[in-house]
């Protein structure tokens, strides 16, 4: 599925009935959230609010409101094809040279995709068609949504933040929410382990007291946005990965006020800096947990330039108790994660992050168990392999006869194959999501692993239970006469 920028993608969505234009006046204050939430829960289309109250700039919501649209953004037709994206990432994370001529041909598609990795630098770009700078900058021109009644202020949610550390050649792209606190001021809420925060820390050490350049792209093409939330290898830039997804090189242009490179087709770009030591209290905000988060101090982003396309579109979303857009995104990205994990742990059959678990706080793993203690090795591997699982509080490991995505199966395994004392692993004083108020200390808490596998010799001294299995001959005989029995007139139960 080929597209060049966000507008191309919206045209594709509209052709397929996946985009709804809203012409009635709708307020960015609470009303857009209510409409977007109802639409997402019904599996509805992306929404383009063409007449936001008090503004002339349209607002795009629910862009990734179904797994299908996430897959389309990654250049695929449906969610099942995302396993191939995961296989490509697994290959790039640990590339293997071809083992002979036939293997070379098998790997040719992957090598061809790599040709789309380098960025294409432009001198002039659509994102700089209109420019405001200095006193002309007024972020109130943008219809920034306020999503929940007790939110502190309007909040930018889909800002693609571009940074570069002082000792790094490649840039970091990350999605960090930003609270509006003035006509040219935002609070940059990034956690200390995230790429942007690490770049800032390194900058402050290398250039004490100097301003840290930052750019925020709003309304980038979907491949670039998704590249920023996908577990790409550290050696691969998000722009390069976006080129792989899109099938064409990512076009970038240099900022007007600094040397950062931004997506050339972005709808809006905010350029500016963070002054070391300038902090402000952020929040509270309703978040993907379903609760308002605590207030905490984060750096202030001062905007010196706003550039945009003609007739720019503002891309936004809301976060709340699942299902919300991040939860849907998590369902789709789950398919990308499976091949990456299987590359490192071939015994893993499936891996599932239930959306009701905030998309990352609980994981279910099914595996082909091969020895006593194997399940514990896998759960430790899940916690340590990808930083995306740093905040996963619960890991449930089951055998491969269990469907990881069926709670009936998983709960049966937990209640019949686990002894709580023997099969529960507790790990204390580990990194925990700052938004997790259940932990005793902010950012530090415990994790639990549940070994719900059948136990092997060495793990139990008792004879293990034998699962009940039907007689296949009897099943076949009853299948043959089932309709004749007419127990269910509507065919139910067959």
Curated annotation (Swiss-Prot):
Q: Name one GO biological process term.
A: ubiquinone biosynthetic process
Q: Which residues bind prenylated FMN?
A: 175-177, 189-191, 194-195
Q: Name one GO molecular function term.
A: metal ion binding
Q: Does the keyword Hydrolase apply?
A: no
Task: Show the coiled coil region(s).
Answer: none
Q: Which UniProt keywords apply?
A: Cell membrane, Decarboxylase, Flavoprotein, FMN, Lyase, Manganese, Membrane, Metal-binding, Ubiquinone biosynthesis
The protein's annotated catalytic reaction(s) are:
a 4-hydroxy-3-(all-trans-polyprenyl)benzoate + H(+) = a 2-(all-trans-polyprenyl)phenol + CO2
Cofactor binding description: Binds 1 prenylated FMN per subunit.
What's the stated role of this polypeptide?
A: Catalyzes the decarboxylation of 3-octaprenyl-4-hydroxy benzoate to 2-octaprenylphenol, an intermediate step in ubiquinone biosynthesis.
Q: How does it assemble?
A: Homohexamer.
Q: Which family does it belong to?
A: Belongs to the UbiD family.
Q: Know the name of this protein?
A: 3-octaprenyl-4-hydroxybenzoate carboxy-lyase
Task: Identify the taxonomic lineage of the organism of origin.
Answer: Bacteria, Pseudomonadati, Pseudomonadota, Gammaproteobacteria, Enterobacterales
């Amino acid at each position: 599925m080929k597209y060049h920028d966000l507008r191309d993608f919206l045209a594709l969505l509209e052709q397929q009935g996946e985009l709804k234009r809203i012409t009635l006046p709708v307020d960015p204050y609470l009303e857009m959230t209510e409409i977007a939430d109802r639409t997402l829960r019904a599996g509805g289309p992306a929404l383009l609010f063409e007449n936001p109250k008090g503004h002339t700039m349209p607002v795009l919501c629910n862009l990734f409101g179904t797994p299908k649209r996430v897959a389309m953004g990654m250049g695929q037709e449906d969610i099942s094809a995302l396993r191939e994206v995961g296989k490509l990432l697994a290959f790039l994370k640990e590339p293997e040279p071809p083992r002979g001529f036939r293997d070379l041909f098998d790997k040719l598609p992957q090598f061809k995709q790599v040709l789309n990795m380098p960025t294409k630098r432009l001198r002039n770009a659509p994102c700089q068609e209109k420019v405001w700078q200095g006193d002309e900058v007024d972020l109130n021109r943008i219809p920034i949504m306020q999503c929940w009644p007790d939110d502190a202020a309007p909040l930018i949610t889909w800002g693609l933040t571009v940074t570069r550390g002082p000792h790094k050649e490649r840039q970091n792209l990350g999605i960090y929410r930003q609270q509006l606190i003035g006509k040219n001021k935002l609070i940059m809420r990034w956690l200390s382990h995230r790429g942007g925060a690490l770049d800032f820390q390194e900058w402050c050490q290398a250039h004490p007291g100097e301003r840290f350049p930052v750019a925020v792209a709003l309304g980038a093409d979907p491949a670039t946005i998704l590249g920023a939330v996908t577990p790409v290898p550290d050696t691969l830039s998000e722009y390069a990965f976006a080129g792989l997804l899109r099938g064409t090189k990512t076009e970038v242009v240099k900022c007007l006020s600094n040397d950062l490179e931004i997506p050339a087709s972005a709808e809006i770009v905010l350029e500016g800096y963070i002054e070391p030591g300038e902090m402000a209290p952020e929040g509270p905000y309703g978040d993907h947990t379903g609760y308002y988060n605590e207030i905490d101090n984060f750096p202030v982003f001062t905007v010196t330039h706003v550039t945009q396309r003609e007739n720019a579109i503002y891309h936004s979303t809301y976060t709340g108790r699942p299902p919300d857009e991040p939860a849907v995104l998590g369902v789709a990205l789950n398919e990308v994660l499976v091949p990456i994990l299987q590359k490192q742990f071939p015994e893993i059959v499936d891996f599932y992050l239930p959306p009701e678990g905030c998309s990352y706080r609980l994981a279910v793993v099914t595996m082909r168990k091969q020895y006593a203690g194997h399940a514990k090795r896998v759960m430790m591997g899940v916690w340590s392999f990808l930083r995306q699982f740093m905040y996963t509080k619960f890991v449930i490991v089951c055998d491969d006869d269990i469907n990881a995505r069926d709670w009936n199966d998983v709960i049966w395994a937990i209640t019949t194959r686990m002894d709580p004392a023997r099969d529960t692993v507790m790990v204390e004083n580990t990194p925990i999501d700052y938004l997790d108020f259940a932990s005793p200390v902010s950012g530090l808490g415990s994790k639990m692993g549940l070994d719900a596998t059948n136990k092997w010799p060495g793990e139990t001294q008792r004879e293990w239970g034998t699962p009940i299995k039907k007689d296949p001959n009897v099943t076949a005989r009853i299948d043959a006469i089932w309709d004749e029995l007419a127990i269910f007139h509507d065919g139910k139960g067959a």
